[in-house]
Amino acid sequence: VRLELLQDAREFWPRAEADIRRAERRVLVQTLSLEGDQAGQALASALRASRAPERRVLIDSFTRHVVNDRFLHSPASLLDGPLRAEVRATRALVAGLSRAGIPVRFTSPAGPLLLRFPARDHRKLVLVDDRVAYLGGINFSEHNFAWRDLMLRIEHERAARFLAADFLRTFRGRPRASSLALPGLELHTFDGRSNARRFEQLLMPLVDAARARIEIEAPYLTQPFLERLVRAAERGVAVTVLTPEVNNFRLVRELLACPVATRGLSVRLYRGRMTHLKAILVDARTLVLGSANFDIWSYHFQGEHLAIVRDAELVRDFESRVLAAGLAGSRPLTRPASAWRGALARLSLRSLERASLFVLGG
């Protein structure tokens, strides 16, 4: 198995674009968000240029409701001319792919009154010729391309076929959870129905078994993952949490600035730009990465990819290059949220979780 970490769009996209353009048999692309800006147009151009006879695109219905990190149905968004122009460009991009003979499907409709909005298909995948697959956190939009993020490039036929089968099940409207074990690498897909059980089987035991240290970088870390990290710290494990200084989700920002919620953890704020990277390093031996944000919604409702990597060379690369850059670009949290703000954030997130479970089941 050949594994490679690609940090940020500047490393990921040139490699993925070259693979797409060289494809001979098929290209499968799955994303939460595809927008009609330079990033989305670059993907569309590469797909149209590919000689592969089979080219398919899966987009979550998120893109029908949120563009450029803006909720499209708010009064301000409805009156925003440039935003509406980007919405039209996004629709034109999708229509252009269809006209080029590239089937496009939207997954996970949000339903009446957007009641199913928490249940997104959050997976990101580029797969070429049952030979190469990319998975991780990067969506196809300019603002996502500007964020700190990470993709895992996997060059292995069995891994590619496994991820292709998962893609095609979802494309046909029949997603299901699945797993593949390879030397130094486990791949797991989550279907949004059995997530809690699978996280408890696959990820939580790694956190619970940590002996010395855990480093986690995540934009939207919440319970139950946060609570397990606090328990690890109570056992004497050194736990470092990297999260964005300027977070586009206010409740999470206030939760992670709350000393009660993060007791025993070293919280560091990544400066200068959003970090959308999601990874956990346990005892400098096991690396967990993929699309999951380690939050309420990934735990219960969202389609996700999870890779558990024990390949020593890749783990060293993550620690020396990716983690080191995150630590160097961050500062310790020095101004905690007030007790009432932290308590309100915790209560609000609990309420959102319970309401979502009531509506969606679970």
Question: What kind of feature is each model-predicted range?
Answer:
Residues 1-362:
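Charged, low-complexity intrinsically disordered terminal segments
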